[in-house]
Amino acid sequence: MKVSKVASIVVFALVLQTTLIPYLVGSWVPLDLVLVAIVYLAMTTSPVTALLSGAAGGVIQDTLSGGIIGVSGIAKTIVGFSVALVGTQIIVVRSFPRFVIFFGATLLHASVFLGLYSMLVAPIPNSSVSSVFGEALGNGLVGAVLFELLRALPRLRWRGMSGSRIKPRLEW
């Protein structure tokens, strides 16, 4: 994957996370679209790309969210690299195993994130078990659905002009 494509995926996730998601889902489903983007990149690219995109996305998210700068960057770096290493050993082609990977990556991210905050003796944000599992469930569902949509996107071909309409055709 080219650097511009990786950067655009991370920036798009950051923009959605900070602008659109708070208005669409509110506070009842905590989603981390940056983490979803990092895990997607980790499953489709190399471990080095996942490591660098996790570090960049996490530090930018820390800067925008007002937390301790670097904590989310370290957590997302560890998650991205770990998922990429697992992805090089295991081929995942079905939706449910992808959901499990997104779910497990969110749990790993939460444990590293909360562990770093507890070592820094800072007030731990969003530390209840139900909120962590809610975020893992939300990220798992969103990640699995987005992975399938992005996988099916190149198969969408435009058939041609019939009158003034363009008819899309999905090839399954």
Predicted features and spans:
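Terminal, non-globular segments
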Residues: M1-W172
